[in-house]
């Protein structure tokens, strides 16, 4: 919540950084700009091409980083880059099928 209003969407680079799935926001931006992140929203899959694309709770993301494929479902957007326990509450792992 910001000023009492729920946050509905967040930039993909900011969310990946807050969720501690990437070490830096610049790395998250590069992943998006290179088209290495797939977003599934309401059954439609899209390859992201910009760091400014948004994610919402319920979206699923699939991306490869450090030789490992990661698939997660966005649960919350978060307001900051908190400790690891707080970051893990922002997503849940899903099978990459």
Cite the ranges covered by each PLM segment.
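Strongly charged
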Residues: 2-18, 29-30, 38-97
């Amino acid at each position: 919540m910001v000023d009492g209003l729920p946050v509905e969407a967040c930039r993909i680079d900011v969310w990946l950084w807050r969720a501690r799935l990437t070490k830096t926001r610049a790395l998250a931006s590069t992943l998006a700009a290179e088209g290495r992140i797939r977003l599934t929203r309401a059954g439609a899959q899209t390859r992201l091409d910009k760091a400014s694309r948004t994610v919402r709770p319920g979206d699923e993301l699939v991306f490869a980083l450090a030789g490992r494929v990661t698939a997660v479902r966005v649960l919350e957007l978060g307001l900051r880059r908190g400790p690891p326990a707080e970051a893990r509450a922002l997503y849940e792992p899903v099978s990459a099928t």
